[in-house]
Every structure is written in C-alpha cells, then in structure tokens.
Design a protein with these regions (language model features):
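Conserved small/polar residues in nucleotide/adenosyl-binding loops
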Residues: 265-266
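Conserved catalytic or metal-liganding residues and their short signature motifs at active sites
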Residues: 1-244, 249-251
Length: 266
C-alpha cells in the first residue's frame, strides 16, 4: 500500500514538473515572439500604466497576437515589469522581451527637426509646426515675442541667432526649448569664431561678424564663392563704402519684400 502511494505521488510530481516545464516553454516562446508589426511603430505609454493596462494596450493596438502569457512572463522576469512612461519606437523583428526591456530602460524614441542654412524665421517656424511630436507653443507669437523668449536683445530678430543643423528631440519637448538649443549652439559657435578671427578685420563686436556672415550667406548659395564675396564686402567696409548688396535691403524690408527686383527707391 505504501509503495502504491509513493508510486502515485511520483506520478503526480512528474506530471506537475512536466506541466511546469510545458508552461515555461510556452512563456519563453511567447517572450521570443516578434511583435505583430511590419514597419516602425510609435507607441505611447501613459504615466501610471500598470501591468494589466499595458497588456490591454498591446492587445488593443494588435502589437501582440495573444496576451495569454503576458502576465506570466512578467512574474517569471519581474525586471521586465519596471516599465517607464514615454514614447517609444518599436521596430520590425523586435520580440516581446526586447520590447519590455526597451520600456524598462526608459530610452524614448528620438525624432529629428532639420533646419537648413539661410532659412528665415518663418521657415524655422514651419519646420517646428510640422514636427508633430513637439509641444507647440509659438503659434501666433511675433518675432519680438520669440526673440524675448530666447533672451535675444530687444530690437533684434531671431534670424542669425539660431544655428542651422539637424536636432533630435523626444516627444513632448516644446518648440521654444528646441529653438533655445539652436540659440545656445549659435552663441558657442559665434564666440569660437570671434576668438579665432583675424584681428585685422573691420569688426568691433561678435554681432557685427555674425551680421556679415548672414549677409554673405544670403548673397550666394555657393559655398566656394563665399570667401570671395566676403573679401569684397570687407574691402568696402574698410574704405567706408556701402555694401550695395540686395540681402541688406531685403533684410531691412522684412516681410514687406515681395520677391521683386530691388531698385534705387529701396
């Protein structure tokens, strides 16, 4: 009788172990299953989202085909449950485990905004407006208001004070915060250029150097021609001659310039 009980108990233990192994295999297979996406997908995880709520979001957005093993995976690997709120980028081939590790890392998706040389403020504003993951706060703001927000002296335009480049940002960053980064970058570049300038050049302040650089940039779009154009303007300044260049007039006309040829009346 005792032997029979031991035999039955042994069978039960084997069955339990087999069931546990089967469950473990299922969980592992689920964890290594690729997300159900064919292209990059942006996923927003709201603050305060719990385990069950996350499962619901993933199933709702059809990112996982079957969430049956999701909670078991989080229990088996609790470090995967430490996910952080944010906006993330999921890529094709990413597995459920890799996705959870990304959410736990807090490494949010990076987006880009590209500003090209020679752009006017309205061009920068258009790029910002088209960047859908930015927080838009500048709508309806005048140049003077934007300049004030950037800490640019009254009476000066933001143009020329913003460094053209491709900037990365995370979802929720404000447009003015991005402009401030471009402004700080320009200030650093200007100070470096001023420190390394030829002291024989007729510029009294870094701002005068920046103004000339902006004029030369607008005078020619060909980089190879800029040194020659700059040389001509410098020589005119040295002899007290007017620059006689359209960009200086167009800049002064601002938004009133309609694209027509500049004449003596201007």
């Amino acid at each position: 009788m005792k032997k029979r009980k031991l035999k039955v108990l042994s069978i039960i233990v084997v069955l339990v172990l087999a069931l546990l192994f089967w469950g473990y295999q299922k969980i592992e297979r689920f964890a290594d299953t690729p997300l159900a996406i064919q292209q990059e997908t942006i996923f927003k995880l709201p603050a305060g989202t719990g385990r069950v709520a996350l499962e619901g979001l993933l199933v709702r957005d059809k990112l996982v085909r079957n969430g049956r093993w999701f909670q078991w995976l989080l229990k088996l690997e609790p470090e995967l449950a430490e996910f952080k709120a944010g906006t993330y980028r999921f890529t094709p081939g990413m597995t459920v485990r890799q996705m959870l590790k990304l959410l736990a890392s807090g490494k949010e998706a990076q987006f880009t905004a590209r500003f090209i040389e020679g752009s006017r403020l309205r061009d920068w504003q258009q790029v910002l407006q088209q960047s859908k993951y930015l927080k838009h706060t500048l709508a309806g703001k005048s140049e003077a208001e934007i300049a004030a927000a950037l800490g640019i002296p009254a009476g000066e335009t933001p143009e020329g004070h913003l460094y053209p480049d491709t900037y990365q940002y995370t979802a929720g960053m404000s447009d003015i915060a991005l402009l401030k980064r471009a402004h700080v970058r320009m200030n650093k570049a200007l100070q470096a250029a001023w420190a390394g300038r030829d002291t024989s050049l007729p510029y009294k302040t870094p701002e005068e150097l920046l103004t000339m650089a902006s004029i030369v940039e607008k005078e020619t779009a060909v980089p190879e021609e800029r040194s020659k154009v700059a040389s001509v303007f410098v020589n005119r300044l040295r002899i007290g001659m007017r620059l006689q260049t359209d960009p200086t007039v167009i800049y002064g006309m601002g938004e009133s310039y309609n694209g027509n040829k500049i004449g003596r009346a201007h």
